[in-house]
């Protein structure tokens, strides 16, 4: 008769987190949505790539919408009601991700754009010649 495998470590139960922060990082190639509590501990995350999109489809607004819905659904299951949103990056999924967060049922308290803008820092990549 086989022995039962005992699990080692502490199992995290469902936490009740009423407030949090939704970080949306929208690049040209992908959109990553991370939801944290006020202290900064990650509750849930999702990206266009983890939702099943591949290649150039990861940079589309629909992929960003799907990623945001998946992350928010997991956060609402843990009791989140409202959140701040910080948006970073120049990608096409910025507005769609914010819209998806609102329609998924999460209240928005603050909306911040934290895209890093250089004060003439690094040299940008060369222009494309098509």
UniProtKB/Swiss-Prot annotation:
Keyword set includes Plastid = yes
HAMAP family, sorted: Ribosomal_uS11
Domain of life per record: Eukaryota
Keyword vocabulary terms for this entry: Chloroplast, Plastid, Ribonucleoprotein, Ribosomal protein, RNA-binding, rRNA-binding
Q: One MF term from GO for this chain?
A: rRNA binding
Family label: Belongs to the universal ribosomal protein uS11 family.
Q: Which GO terms describe its cellular component?
A: chloroplast; ribonucleoprotein complex; ribosome
Quaternary state and partners of this protein?
Part of the 30S ribosomal subunit.
Q: Which GO terms describe its biological process?
A: translation
Q: Which PANTHER family match?
A: 40S RIBOSOMAL PROTEIN S14/30S RIBOSOMAL PROTEIN S11
What compartments host this protein? Plastid, Chloroplast
Q: Which Gene3D superfamilies match?
A: Ribosomal protein S11
User: What is the protein's given name?
Assistant: Small ribosomal subunit protein uS11c
Plastid keyword on record: yes
């Amino acid at each position: 008769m086989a022995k039962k495998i005992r699990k080692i470590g502490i199992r995290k139960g469902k936490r009740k987190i009423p407030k949090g922060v939704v970080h949306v990082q929208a690049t040209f190639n992908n959109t990553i949505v991370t939801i944290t509590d006020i202290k900064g501990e990650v509750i849930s995350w999702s990206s266009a790539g983890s939702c099943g999109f591949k290649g150039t489809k990861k940079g589309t607004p629909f992929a960003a919408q799907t990623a945001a819905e998946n992350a928010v659904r997991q956060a609402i299951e843990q009791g989140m009601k409202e959140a701040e949103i910080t948006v970073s990056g120049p990608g096409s999924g910025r507005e769609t991700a914010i819209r998806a967060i609102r329609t998924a049922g999460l209240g928005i308290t603050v909306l911040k754009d934290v895209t890093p803008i250089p004060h003439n820092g690094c040299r940008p990549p060369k222009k494309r010649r098509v």
